[in-house]
From Swiss-Prot:
Residues 560-632 are annotated as: C. The gene is htpG. It comes from Burkholderia mallei (strain ATCC 23344). Gene3D superfamilies: 3.30.230.80, 3.40.50.11260, Heat shock protein 90, C-terminal domain (1.20.120.790), Histidine kinase-like ATPase, C-terminal domain (3.30.565.10). This is Chaperone protein HtpG. It is found in: Cytoplasm. One of its GO terms (cellular component) is cytoplasm. Homodimer. Disulfide bonds: none annotated. The keyword ATP-binding applies.
Length: 632
């Protein structure tokens, strides 16, 4: 049998049904698609009229008109663009996935393509009208053809259509949607305006509707003869920065972010190269109430050639920058056929990287401001979004160092809970012999400030960062060093604050040897509660403290995981005792109440670091017994 090449067969009725009811997730999209087609028709006329001005037919003011008829249950979209001939109507409307725009675009020269702002590329947008209509009537005449060569195209979306030649004086296209049952809510001026303003507000053509006014006698809105433009018909981001005032940027932010307050900062630029796009990004001055909700949708508004595609385009910004508001307008982003989903590609990745770098540059300018007003702005930003930005240390490996420079913490340098210390500030204040950046984590600033682990640091004048945000422990698992200086927890491992002289070293060794019987007996008494017991010289005022081994999870992180309902490995801390404290000095390994004192020192250390006692009743009973024995 000889090999044959065959064409796939398609049941057109089924294909139309599948496309109409499966391609689009939101029925409002039909108006965006039809307005986009009308905009393309105007652009085509402009280009052809460059060589033949007579195509304007004494009507050079291009526009789109939107109207509805409640009695007839129809919505009409009318444009005075290029229009279609009979053959074009049959080819473009009668062939699924044929794009007249795409074919027209392919005929343009390179320079003309760069200047064109044509939107359609799939040839399926027209059929979105069948989402809300059970019949569509199109009347059209191509510019330059006589009125006798008008065309009427009509279909019920069932796999066939009818075409007639009609008399049509007006150039352009009129699309009438005969609505399905249950779609009457669209027969409202307010409803249609809201859809246009959501999706097509920045289409270059004015979109006109008849004005409505309240009629007191009839008790309803009545249509007037006067037209009104219902879209902005311009996109602020397409203008040069020098042409836009600060007040206009602020007003646009309030419009796009639905926020009544001014932004802290903004950045506006056009990127040219393999991926061409314009970005206008804003930093809000306050966090939305639902920023930490599981369902919070962050991201930018995505436009393609000034037509709104989607809110919350999460693919264009990493999660830790979800608070950034603004728009990205691209001319060549890959979308799926319904233009509702952004497809992953090298272009999307390049735009994401570019937008991320631009957003970080904007934050760096805020953070590095020298004037008081600029510093105050960054304080406001950090208070609102600092915890979110910390997520970037773990999420964005490529920009980790840039994000780290933007971080701010409270520290022992100032006696306030203000998070205003940058890591660079800390490094600049380090002692000559200091090799590490020290920090302590706790539930609250008060608990961190009063942690017994800080005692020796205060004595030696070494600054310690006070970390109290829930994200800090997770962040530190990714941030191991800054400017070549390792970050070290004051509550983990052995403490090394610099070299000791021979006399100090000998004294500590002798003290440790003398305390060995007590330490061994404490290990035996506390058993599984502790991983080890050892003498420490990090304490000056407290009798004991708990530390984690170098490779173990900290007690604070374990408590945080439990509070979040997650499983955490069992925590065995190391109990360190201060040999110079009177309570420790009074311990005798053979004393009758030695066990009670051991448990009391452990429980006190646990409470001091913000932990919770497993058996509070026993702690109270033991404490009372020891107090009574001392009183006696």
């Amino acid at each position: 049998m000889t090999q044959q090449t065959m064409s796939f067969q398609a049941e057109v009725k089924q294909l139309l049904h599948l496309m109409i009811h499966s391609l689009y997730s939101n029925k409002e999209i039909f108006l965006r698609e039809l307005v986009s087609n009308a905009s393309d028709a105007a652009d085509k006329l402009r280009f052809e009229a460059l060589e033949n001005n007579a195509l304007y037919e004494s009507d050079p003011n291009l526009r789109i008109r939107l109207s509805f008829d409640k009695a007839a249950r129809t919505i009409t979209i009318d444009d005075n663009g290029i229009g279609m001939s009979r053959d074009e109507a049959i080819a473009n409307l009668g062939t699924i996935a044929r794009s007249g725009t795409k074919e027209f675009f392919s005929k343009l020269s390179g320079d003309q393509q760069k200047d064109a702002a044509l939107i359609g590329q799939f040839g399926v947008g027209f059929y979105s009208g069948f989402i809300v209509a059970d019949r569509i009537t199109v009347e059209t005449r191509r510019a330059g053809l006589p009125a006798s060569e008008g065309v009427r195209w009509e279909s019920a979306g069932e796999g066939d259509f009818q075409v007639d030649t009609i008399e049509r004086a007006a150039r352009g296209t009129t699309i009438t949607l005969h609505l399905r049952e249950g779609e009457d809510e669209l027969l409202s001026s307010y409803r249609l305006k809201s859809i246009v303003q959501k999706y097509s507000d920045h289409v270059a053509l004015p979109i006109l509707m008849k004005k409505e006014e309240w009629d007191q006698e009839k008790g309803e809105m009545v249509e007037k003869d006067e037209d009104e433009t219902i879209n902005q018909a311009s996109a602020l981001w397409t203008r040069a920065k020098s042409e836009v005032t600060d007040e206009q940027y602020k007003q646009f932010y309030q419009h796009v972010a639905h926020d009544h307050q001014d932004p802290l900062a903004w950045t506006h630029n056009r990127v040219e190269g393999r991926s061409e796009y314009t970005q206008l990004l804003f930093v809000p001055s306050h966090a939305p109430f639902d920023l930490w909700n599981r369902d919070y949708r962050g991201g930018l508004k995505l436009y393609v050639k000034r037509v709104f595609i989607m809110d919350d385009a999460e693919q264009l910004l990493p999660q830790y920058l979800r608070f950034i508001k603004g728009v990205v307008d691209s001319s060549d982003l890959p979308l799926n056929v319904s233009r509702e989903i952004l497809q992953e590609s090298r272009d999307v990745k390049a735009i994401r990287e570019g937008v991320t770098k631009r957003a970080l540059s904007m934050l760096e300018e805020l953070a590095n401001a020298e004037d008081d007003a600029g510093k105050e702005k960054y304080k406001t930003f950090w208070s609102a979004f600092g915890q979110v930005l910390k997520e970037g240390v773990g999420e964005d490996h490529a920009n980790r160092e840039r994000v780290a420079k933007l971080l701010r913490f409270a520290s022992t340098h100032g006696d306030t809970d203000a998070q205003d210390v940058a890591l660079a500030d800390y490094v600049a204040r380090m002692k000559p012999e200091q090799t590490k950046i020290y920090y302590v984590t706790a539930d609250t600033w008060q608990a961190a400030k009063n942690s017994p682990h800080l005692e020796v640091f205060r004595k030696k004048g070494v600054e310690v960062l006070l970390l109290t945000d829930r994200v800090d422990e997770w962040m530190l698992s990714f941030l191991h060093e800054f400017d070549g200086k390792p970050l070290a927890s004051v509550a983990r491992g052995d403490l090394d604050l610099g070299a000791l002289n021979d006399d100090e070293k000998k004294a500590q060794e002798e003290t440790g040897e003398a305390m060995k019987p007590v330490v061994d007996k404490m290990k035996e008494t506390l058993g599984e509660k502790v991983k080890d017991v050892r003498v420490t010289f990090r304490l000056t005022d407290s009798p004991s403290c708990l530390v984690a081994d170098d490779n173990d999870m900290s007690g604070y992180l374990q408590r945080m995981l439990k509070a979040a309902g997650q499983s955490a490995p069992s925590f065995q801390p190391i109990l360190e005792i201060n040999p110079e404290h009177p309570l420790v000095k009074a311990l005798k390994a053979d004393g009758a109440d030695f066990g009670d004192w051991c448990h009391l020192l452990f429980d006190q250390a646990l409470l001091a670091e913000g932990g919770a006692l497993e058996d509070p009743a026993s702690f109270v009973k033991r404490t009372n017994a020891l107090l009574l024995s001392r009183a006696a």
